[in-house]
Amino acid sequence: RHAASRGVTLALEPHVGASVNNPGRILWLLEQIDSPYLKINFDISHFDVVGISIEEAVPQLAPHTVHTHVKDQRGQHPDFEFLIPGEGTFDYVRYLRAMQETGYTGYITAEVSVMVQRRPDYDPYAAAELSYRTLSNAFENAGVNRG
């Protein structure tokens, strides 16, 4: 109610290892609270590392999404690592096309995980450059307007 009284939308991020960690749980929570001021911050990587596909997650969650960010990953939960976009094999083209098919028109941004930031050789400028190049190429190859 506090957010609604100020016209603020809150975005919850389903997260691997958390109690809200799959499409069913976040959709149940949204249904229980039933507020137009509660949406999803959709990070597909948290679904990918537990084996939930783009085709399963995107159609369910994109209609309730107010923001999304992406990063790469390697491995499967519990033995996984988040990576800089472009360091892994995530299919950004397929993801962008799936988001577009749902009518999502909001922001899609890159996230650099704390796992990456803790690397002794972490370079934020190199991470930003790789992220930009990776996502820019993906948008172009997907035929999705960056708006």
Feature locations, PLM:
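Generic helix-packing signal
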Residues: 7, 30, 61, 132-135
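C-terminal helical cap(s) of enzyme catalytic domains, especially alpha/beta-barrels
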Residues: 120-146
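Short, flexible helix/strand-to-coil boundary loops that buttress conserved ligand/catalytic motifs
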Residues: 34, 62, 139
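Hydrophobic faces of well-ordered beta-strands that scaffold small-molecule active sites
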Residues: 10-12, 38-42, 66-70, 106-112
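Active-site acidic/histidine proton-transfer and metal-coordination neighborhood
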Residues: 1-40, 49, 142-146
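Gly/Pro-rich active-site loop or hairpin
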Residues: 19, 23-27, 31, 46-105, ...
